[in-house]
Amino acid sequence: MENPEQYFELVQERPDLFANPSGAIITILLGQEEIAQAETSMQEALSAQGVTQEKAREWAQVGVAYHDQYLLVLRDAVRFPDGAIGSYIRLVAPREQTPGVVILPIYQGQILLLRHFRHATRSWHLEIPRGFGWPGCTSEESARRELVEELGAEPLRLVPLGQIHPNTGITAECDELFYAEVATYGTPEKREAIGEILPTPLSLFERLIRENTITDGFTLAAYARARARGLL
């Protein structure tokens, strides 16, 4: 196992991360024998794919694969729906925290898009404000703070649009969507890497979606939810 003490501390401190709810068909295994079996099975599978023995051993280890203030990567021993035992990797929040927030801001009937440089893709994106949840804050309070940071704006109206799980195949991340109406907007904080704020009519916004110019999943989700609620 990789970092077994840290892994089993998590099992005790955050049992919800390791729950097997009724009807779960991918089952987390916590017994030592089952974990050893999962590691052996995965190592053999990786070797069969041409992975070196050293890497196969490393990539098959169950436990905490990586941990910092932003990310916690777990590799769990699991039983798959066909009965096979192996391992499965996932990203979870490093601590219990307020969900992230995503805000669709409306100014004088137009959507405020940000031209935002993102390190992960090394490119510019058209997207709406979003960010981590603030410790000790409600989601609504986090949304208000995010609008101040990225738009220099205070919302006149803030409407919850529900939750989104952006990538259920790899991460447990869950974020809260909001619709916001603002009377004014200003200048984003410099550290936010925002090039400009673009008031965008709905017709143009939808054309940017059709033309594959807007590709940010959070932006698309908030738009779809607001449309379905009759807010746009």
PLM ranges: what are they?
Residues 57-102:
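Acidic, metal-coordinating catalytic segment for phosphate/diphosphate chemistry
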Residues 75-79, 105, 179-181, 199-201:
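Short, well-ordered beta-strand micro-motif
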Residues 150:
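Short alpha-helical functional segments enriched in proximate histidine and acidic residues
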Residues 154-161:
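A short coil-to-beta-strand element that immediately follows conserved catalytic motifs
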Residues 23-65:
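N-terminal positively charged helical leader segments and presequences
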Residues 78-82, 167-186:
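Active-site-adjacent beta-strand/loop module that shapes the phosphate/pyrophosphate-binding cleft
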Residues 29, 91-94, 98-145, 191:
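Conserved Nudix-box catalytic region and its N-terminal flanking loop in Nudix hydrolases
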Residues 1-41, 120-124, 169-170, 175, ...:
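Nudix hydrolase/Nudix homology domain
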